[in-house]
Amino acid sequence: MRYAPTVLRARTLSIWFAAITVMASGSALAEEVLSDEPADTLKYVVGLAATSSSNYPGSANNEFKLRPLWALQYGRLRISTSRAGGFMSNASETVNPGASAELIRHDRLKIGAGLRIDGGRSPSDDPLLASLPEIRRTLRARVYASYAITEQWGVSTGITQDLLGREGGATALMDTSYRTRLSPQTELLLGGGLSFGNGKYMNSYFGVPQASSLQSGLPAYQPGAGIRDVHAAIGLTTHLSDRWIIFGELNLSRLLGDAASSPLTQKSSNVGGSIGLAYRCCD
């Protein structure tokens, strides 16, 4: 179903209004829980990273890019690019990109919500996708929670949903992490977990519609909801000074289930990574 532009604009504005309201109320709640924290201050991170990642999930090819890193945080409100948000504190964290608000932070538990732009997928991303429909850019909402089992071990989970009805569907993940200091300046982070997609997400990213099958020669394919991949990462972060940080990360993932069986999956396993330099201010 296609929406008229005015209806879509109204819907988008209402989504943003609701999200801002949730973030604001969540910040107030967090202030009640953490009333002994110091006054809110503005923090930021800027930097640059070289990254390697697959053209799309299941692609046989990796693309290399230079990406800017930036993040802004005021109290429990944060907006950041991928990876940058984790450098706001002396102990690196796993922080998803986009805008987020920490709604509850009590002892070892954190609960939050956020928004991010999902870039979708273009037929031009890979020759194999040329006859497939575009997956349009959309806005995703995310709810997440993490729990520190010990100072070193932690678990986290999150759910995302396409808010604009652009066939992005819903995703979920469950992760565990281990972090330890190799020296006063250097921290090692190990992590791994599973990701899942509902039927709409899996069909958009791993399905082949009948019409596209006739054009591309690929067999028609309609995956069901379920597990998408298993993934792991190892990362090192070194503080060169109070402000400057250098980091590197190696990522491994393997598609499973219907995602691995898709005609679009040229390679079920992928190795990627990043290395970069960032400047952080001000504690």
What are these regions (language model features)?
Residues L29-I79, G85-F87, R108-K110, R121:
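Short glycine/proline- and aromatic-enriched beta-strand/turn motifs that initiate or cap beta-hairpins
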Residues M1-T41, D283:
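Cleavable N-terminal export/targeting peptides
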Residues V46-L48, W70, T81, I111-L115, ...:
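Membrane-embedded beta-strand positions of outer-membrane beta-barrel proteins
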Residues A50-S54, Y74-R76, G85-F87, L115-R121, ...:
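Transmembrane beta-strands of outer-membrane beta-barrel pores
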Residues Y44, R76-S80, L109, E151-V155, ...:
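Repeated loop/turn-to-beta-strand initiation elements of outer-membrane beta-barrel proteins
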Residues L42, N62-P68, D107, I135-A141, ...:
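Residues that define the transmembrane beta-barrel architecture of outer-membrane proteins
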Residues E31-V33, D162-A260, L264-Q266, C281-D283:
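Outer-membrane beta-barrel transmembrane domain signature
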Residues R67-L69, Q73-G75, T176, S268-D283:
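Outer-membrane beta-barrel "beta-signal"
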